[in-house]
Design a protein with these regions (language model features):
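Short C-terminal domain-edge/linker segments immediately following a structured domain
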Residues: 61-66, 80-83, 126-130, 168-169
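Loop-to-helix element that buttresses phosphate recognition and phosphoryl-transfer chemistry
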Residues: 75-79
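RNase H-like nuclease fold core
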Residues: 22-74, 85-93
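RNase H catalytic domain
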Residues: 37-41, 81-153, 163
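Intrinsically disordered, low-complexity regions
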Residues: 1-30, 58-61, 90, 132, ...
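N-terminal start-of-chain detector that recognizes signal peptides
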Residues: 19-24, 67-70, 109-112, 168
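A glycine- and small-aliphatic-rich helix-loop capping segment at beta-alpha/alpha-beta transitions
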Residues: 50-54, 114-117, 158
């Protein structure tokens, strides 16, 4: 007789291109995409994020936050922080993260050092949010595959406002 319960399902997706950040998958992961924009750089900025239900393009939430003055990289970090905080607040435990900033992706994963002092505190804040999750992996994607988060950040810069939109399941 098998020691494994017949209804036990092992949740484990291949991590093609993802950098492992924390833990093991305990459930199907949600997908978080983030972005940041500054116009000009530095100048009025916004960070934004969208969280999708596991294996779908159906959003759980989308959020952007206006920043009166920041660099593009600061705005990118703010997009990541916004997404992590909202996902944590929603009780999400398993997370795949995607963004189009190689710098932020690799710094967050720990593969690149943080050389700019203005990014160190944002990096620390983002990493501190990891305590809320069981599993996190992160991946760089091309800008065109990050269109939803990109649209949010551009909306934030244009509207000079901050918005949270929740969607029904």
């Amino acid at each position: 007789m098998s020691a494994i319960h017949p209804f036990f399902i092992k949740w484990s997706l291949p991590l093609d291109g993802y950098l492992h950040v924390k833990g093991k998958q305990t459930a199907p992961p949600h997908l978080l995409q983030f972005d940041g924009a500054s116009d000009p750089n530095p100048g009025p900025s916004a960070g934004g994020a969208v969280l999708f239900h596991p294996g779908t393009t159906d959003p759980v939430f989308e959020r952007y936050e206006f920043i009166p003055h920041a660099t593009n990289n600061e705005a990118e970090y703010n997009g990541l922080i916004i997404g992590l905080q909202e996902a944590a607040d929603a009780g999400i435990k398993n997370l795949l993260i995607e963004g189009d900033s190689n710098l932020i992706i690799n710094q967050f994963a720990g593969t690149w050092k943080i050389k700019a002092e203005n990014l160190a505190s944002l990096h620390k804040k983002a990493r501190a949010l990891l305590t809320h999750f069981d599993f996190v992996a992160i991946k760089h994607i091309p800008r065109e595959k990050n269109a939803h988060a990109d649209r949010l950040t551009n909306e934030g810069v244009a509207q000079k406002d901050s918005v949270l939109r929740l969607f029904e399941s």
